[in-house]
């Protein structure tokens, strides 16, 4: 079963990279909460090593705004690398997917 989940993770990684190149997104806890509160977020991605309290707050705001949440398998270092950034990314919200079909695949 591990190869299937690994392939699925690579598929999500490539779709996320395409979204970063062609769509609109916000990085970081404060901007993700702001996009959830205003209703602009279409998808929230949370890294695996995000603190529990922060994760539960994001889940709460996502539940209020009826926004889907995806739990990234890797830590915030890996999520930052997938996004093409040289820093850690704990949370990100996708405002517009651009050319990617990540919203329908998750």
From Swiss-Prot:
Superkingdom, taxonomy of origin: Eukaryota
GO molecular function: pre-mRNA 5'-splice site binding; RNA binding; structural constituent of ribosome
Record field: transmembrane: none
Entry's Gene Ontology cellular component terms: cytosolic large ribosomal subunit
InterPro entries referenced in this protein's UniProt entry, alphabetically: Ribosomal_eL30-like (IPR039109), Ribosomal_eL30-like_sf (IPR029064), Ribosomal_eL30_CS (IPR022991), Ribosomal_eL8/eL30/eS12/Gad45 (IPR004038)
Pfam (any one): Ribosomal_L7Ae
Coarse class of the protein's main subcellular location: cytoplasm
Localization of this protein: Cytoplasm
Keyword field: Cytoplasm, Ribonucleoprotein, Ribosomal protein
One example of a Gene Ontology biological process annotation: negative regulation of mRNA splicing, via spliceosome
Keyword Translocase attributed: no
UniProt-listed PROSITE patterns: RIBOSOMAL_L30E_1, RIBOSOMAL_L30E_2
Gene3D superfamilies reported for this sequence: 3.30.1330.30
Function as written in the Swiss-Prot or TrEMBL entry: Component of the ribosome, a large ribonucleoprotein complex responsible for the synthesis of proteins in the cell. The small ribosomal subunit (SSU) binds messenger RNAs (mRNAs) and translates the encoded message by selecting cognate aminoacyl-transfer RNA (tRNA) molecules. The large subunit (LSU) contains the ribosomal catalytic site termed the peptidyl transferase center (PTC), which catalyzes the formation of peptide bonds, thereby polymerizing the amino acids delivered by tRNAs into a polypeptide chain.
Family the entry assigns: Belongs to the eukaryotic ribosomal protein eL30 family.
Subunit details: Component of the large ribosomal subunit. Mature ribosomes consist of a small (40S) and a large (60S) subunit. The 40S subunit contains about 32 different proteins and 1 molecule of RNA (18S). The 60S subunit contains 45 different proteins and 3 molecules of RNA (25S, 5.8S and 5S).
Name of the protein described by the UniProt record: Large ribosomal subunit protein eL30
Native organism: Candida albicans (strain SC5314 / ATCC MYA-2876) (Yeast)
Gene (name only): RPL30
